[in-house]
Amino acid sequence: MQLQIHNTTRRKLDDALLCRAVETVIQGEGRHALEIAAVYCGSRMSRRINREYLQHDWPTDTISFPYGSGGNVEGEFYICLDVIEENARRFNTDFERELFRVTIHSVLHLAGYDDHLPEDRRRMTEREDSYLQQLFR
């Protein structure tokens, strides 16, 4: 798997642990990854991408663009660190845990998961919880 991590902010991130999170999901889902680009950005970039691709004029925690087909996982995702920080406060959790939850969530989208329906959201949340437990034992 070729994983490119791009951090467009000044905030320090643990690239090795982020890579491990992506690999954990890919392996756990029994999938093969080709190329994945993970972009960690601020509100301005997130808002621009959200507006351009989803016609929503606000920053969001993550936007995923899957390119893979069949059993392959390929694509890119953008995670807004400003929104992650806000959500961590709102959900009474720490920044790192929320960052990894959303990273896992993004990779699940690349692997074909959807969260439009309540049962799909529940299924994704269960997978996220499982992978978070593996990462933070």
Swiss-Prot record:
Zn(2+) binds at H105, H109, D115. Its EC number is 3.1.-.-. GO terms for biological process: rRNA processing. Pfam families: YbeY. It is an enzyme of class 3 (hydrolase). It comes from the Bacteria. Binds 1 zinc ion. InterPro entries: MetalPrtase_cat_dom_sf_prd (IPR023091), YbeY (IPR002036), YbeY_CS (IPR020549). SUPFAM superfamilies: Metalloproteases ('zincins'), catalytic domain (SSF55486). Belongs to the endoribonuclease YbeY family. NCBIfam families: rRNA maturation RNase YbeY. This is Endoribonuclease YbeY.
